[in-house]
Amino acid sequence: MIKPKNILFAWFWLTCTLTHAQLTMPRATSTYWRDSVPEAMRQSYISYGAQYIGQPWATIPDSIFGEFRRNGNRTHYEQLCFQKRTQLAAVAMAEIIEGKGRFIPDLKAGLDNLLAEPWWGIPAHYGPAQPKQKDQTVDLFNAETAGLVAWIRYMLNEALGHDMQ
């Protein structure tokens, strides 16, 4: 019978015995992405990302953000927000898989656009106009966007260069 203490021991043992290299995701420069990912899957990622080359990056007007407060509509904001993040992830993944630099200009433009947003959350999660100092919650969508940016920086750090740090 598996007991909680056995699970904790196994987790502790594994984390102590695995090397850093075994826990590290291969970066975009690794041959893993071109050698280990099946060709059909690679082509799918590349063609999905290619549809966004040269496409504009959505800017979300304050009026759309404010719709939730005015009339309860959150879908207009969410459509623009999710589309932008989908576009960014698609371009990033295409560059990781292809590795030729073709997606880098669009990726930089998308990161600039995303980093210029005043808030990464969803209007329905914004809370009162004057948040309480003791209320230190982390919004799920803020964290998800931060994770996306961190993942892109980790994977494509060299390709993005110093101007994106």
Can you say where each PLM-predicted feature lies in the sequence?
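Short secondary-structure junctions and interdomain/linker hinges
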Residues: 15, 52-60, 98, 117-121
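Low-complexity, Ser/Thr/Pro/Gly-enriched N-terminal "stalk/linker" regions
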Residues: 23-69
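Short, functional N-terminal and low-complexity linear motifs
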Residues: 53-60, 73-74, 113, 140, ...
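Short glycine/proline-rich turn/loop motifs
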Residues: 67-73, 129
